[in-house]
Every structure is written in C-alpha cells, then in structure tokens.
C-alpha cells in the first residue's frame, strides 16, 4: 500500500452509495450510520446535489479569491441569513475553519491589548489536527507527539461553570466550545453552561467561539446547535456536512469579531465555485419547509428506541445526544471498538468515539425503517458479546 498508516481502517473498499446505503467492490451493502463522520447529511448520491456538482463542474471549478464568484457569494448570503447575520470566510475543512477562528480571536485581543491573547477551551474537546486547533483540543493523547504546542491556551472542565469562571481573566481573548462534544463521545453542553459562557465572555470582553463542525448543518434538528440552546456566539465554525461530501469549511463572525483585513488570512481553494455550489444546494435542502422538523422527529424516535435498548442490555451504560447525533456508551467490560467491528461484520457502519462510546450519525434523510434496522442490528451484536 502507498498510503501513510494514519487510520485504523475497517477491511472494506467502497465504490458507490445511494441514500443511507454504501456498497463495497464485492457488491455488499452496508447501512451507513457514519455519514462519512457527519458529512453526507443528504445521504449518498442525492440527485439534486449530484446535478448541482455536475452543472458547476461544466462551468467553473476553481478561480482565485482575487476575484469574485457567484456560488461563493450566494453561499455566504445563505449562511449569514440563516444564522446571526454575520460575515463569512471560507476554508476547506473544519480544522482550517478553527485555525481561522484562532487568528480572529488573537487579532481581536491584540486590538484591545498586547496582553489579551489567552484562549480557553474545554477538556475532552476536539477542534482539529493542525497545530493551532490541536492545541485548542483538550486531549493530551493527541497533543503529546507534537509538543511544544502553540502557547497561550488553557483548559477548563466542560459543563463546569465554576471552573470556567476561575479561568477567565482580562487577558482572555476567546473561549472555544463545542455545543455538543463529538469525538469525546457525544456530550451535550447544558443550557446553563453555555449561557454562563456567554455572560463571562461579555464581562471580560472575549469572543465566544462555537465549533459546530460536527454538530452543525441540521444534525440536531436545527441548522446549527446554538439555535437549540438560544445562546448566540460571536464566531461560528462549520464544515463536514456543509458540502454534503465536497470539502468545505466556513467561519461566520458577527460585527464585533469582524477584524480580519486583506493580508491577515487567506486560502487557495477555500470558497471555490464547485464546493460552494454544493454548499448552496445542501443549505437549500436543509431549510426546506419541514425538513429540520423531521430530523428532530427522527432523532426523538431513534433516542426512544435506544433508551429502550439500554433498559434491555446491561452492557449499555448511557445513551445521550441530540437529534441525529447520538452516542451509545458501554460499560468497561465491553470495548467500543469491538462493538463497532461486530456492527461492521453485520453490515452496519458506526463510528467509535471517546469514553468507550460509539456514534450514530446517520444521513439526515434516513428512513424510519433504516433506524429500526440499525437498532435491531446493534441489539444482535450486543447479544453476541
């Protein structure tokens, strides 16, 4: 093999997909409850997304950000009007979006004081794998091989108001938070915690940054999770589902955080016409009347089925999440990797996460019968462990 050994891969090579199903080169069908890790929000090969990409590829795939392009302008308008009316910077990935947010936070602080540069983020958070976002990621297991990290970061206990309050000071320029911690095992923030984070950022003149790379783009039943909580950030990062499978990330800032000027930041590929056309299509689909309400209903249905399963199987320690972003945590005697492997062998794809958890992240277009099949398959796996 010519690929670097950076992933623990399952033994399948996929060649095509349709809806909630993905097929390997032998023709085996798998029920995909990973969505490419929260990416394929419209499922595989959604006809309107495919048509939009084909059409744009025939017109203009890429042009420099030294010029304007219509899909980029349209997507920025859609993101702004469907959030808090901010300005948008486009990147290619979630980690790129978070790196941009770090630079925005640092410049915001520097405009206030040379000493206002500290960034606070949560223990067990995940913000990306490039050096700045890795430093913001409060997980030493990812950080240790790449030390020394970027200076000026400190960590607080997630959902612990008192710890966040202790860490706040006048030299803090930003607080980074995932409204729902994804990689650490689907851990939602409490409303009280996010409300207090908002108050503290206002009190200390710091930016509140919400990383919605995984929990955004309709996954919770709202376009963005902050809309479920009613707590509005200064900076919002998104990626994954934004392109429906095409790489794209974005940062949305309010007027307060709109500090970048020409030369401060940039990207070659971010905001290219092809990716933005995909993003426009995704947002138009997600914001169609009734779509997000149905996501919430499906999420409630899935949660109910999984809670019933928890009562039936002692090895299940917890079920938590929001919308179609749900974590199933197992007791110590069962390995989440073993469960994920057995699910794979039974043609169900799930994502292992921290805290001995697997993630259910189906396409937002998943059908109720497919939800039933996924839960029944997981039950079958647990019976054999």
From Swiss-Prot:
Its cofactor is pyridoxal 5'-phosphate. InterPro entries: AcOrn/SuccOrn_fam, Aminotrans_3, Aminotrans_3_PPA_site, Class-III_PLP-dep_AT, PyrdxlP-dep_Trfase, PyrdxlP-dep_Trfase_major, PyrdxlP-dep_Trfase_small. The keyword Lyase does not apply. It holds the Pfam family Aminotran_3. Keywords: Amino-acid biosynthesis, Aminotransferase, Arginine biosynthesis, Cytoplasm, Pyridoxal phosphate, Transferase. Its EC number is 2.6.1.11. Pathway: Amino-acid biosynthesis; L-arginine biosynthesis; N(2)-acetyl-L-ornithine from L-glutamate: step 4/4. The modification N6-(pyridoxal phosphate)lysine is found at residue 240. It is found in: Cytoplasm. Pyridoxal 5'-phosphate binds at residues 94-95, 126, 211-214, 268. N(2)-acetyl-L-ornithine binds at residues 129, 267. GO terms for biological process: L-arginine biosynthetic process. Binds 1 pyridoxal phosphate per subunit. It catalyses: N(2)-acetyl-L-ornithine + 2-oxoglutarate = N-acetyl-L-glutamate 5-semialdehyde + L-glutamate. GO terms for cellular component: cytoplasm. It comes from the Bacteria. May also have succinyldiaminopimelate aminotransferase activity, thus carrying out the corresponding step in lysine biosynthesis. Homodimer. NCBIfam families: argD, PRK01278.1, PRK03244.1. Belongs to the class-III pyridoxal-phosphate-dependent aminotransferase family. ArgD subfamily. This is Acetylornithine aminotransferase. It comes from Thermotoga maritima (strain ATCC 43589 / DSM 3109 / JCM 10099 / NBRC 100826 / MSB8).
């Amino acid at each position: 093999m010519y690929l670097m050994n950076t992933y623990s891969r399952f033994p399948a090579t996929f060649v095509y997909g349709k809806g909630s199903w993905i097929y390997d080169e032998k023709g085996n069908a798998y029920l995909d409850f990973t969505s490419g890790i929260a990416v394929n929000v419209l499922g595989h090969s959604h006809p309107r997304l495919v048509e939009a990409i084909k059409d744009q590829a025939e017109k203009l795939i890429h042009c420099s950000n030294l010029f304007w392009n219509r899909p980029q302008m349209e997507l920025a308008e859609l993101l702004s009007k469907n959030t808090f009316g901010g300005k948008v910077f486009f990147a290619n990935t979630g980690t790129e979006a978070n790196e941009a947010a770090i630079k925005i936070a640092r410049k915001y602080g520097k405009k206030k004081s040379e000493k206002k540069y500290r960034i606070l983020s949560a223990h067990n958070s995940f913000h990306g794998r490039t050096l700045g976002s890795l430093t913001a990621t409060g997980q030493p297991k990812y950080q240790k091989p790449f030390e020394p990290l970027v200076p000026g970061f400190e960590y607080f206990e997630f959902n612990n108001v008192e710890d966040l309050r202790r860490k706040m000071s006048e030299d803090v320029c930003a607080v980074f938070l995932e409204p729902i911690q994804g990689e650490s095992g689907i851990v939602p923030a409490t409303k009280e915690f996010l409300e207090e984070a908002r108050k503290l950022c206002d009190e200390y003149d710091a930016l509140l940054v919400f990383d919605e790379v995984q929990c955004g783009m309709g996954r919770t039943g709202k376009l963005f999770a902050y809309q479920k909580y009613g707590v509005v950030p200064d900076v919002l990062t998104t990626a994954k589902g934004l392109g429906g499978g095409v790489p794209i990330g974005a940062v949305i800032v309010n007027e307060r955080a709109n500090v970048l000027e020409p030369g401060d930041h940039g990207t070659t590929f971010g905001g290219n016409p092809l990716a933005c056309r995909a993003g426009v299509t995704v947002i138009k689909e997600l914001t169609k009347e009734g779509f997000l309400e149905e996501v919430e209903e499906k999420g409630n249905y899935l949660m109910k089925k999984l809670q019933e399963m928890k009562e039936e199987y002692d090895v299940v320690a917890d079920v938590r999440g929001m919308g179609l972003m749900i974590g199933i945590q197992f007791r110590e005697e069962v390995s989440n990797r073993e469960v994920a492997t057995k699910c794979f062998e039974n043609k169900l794809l799930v994502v292992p996460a921290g805290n001995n958890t697997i993630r259910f992240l189906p396409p937002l277009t998943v059908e109720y019968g497919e939800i039933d099949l996924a839960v029944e398959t997981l039950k079958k796996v647990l019976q054999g462990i």
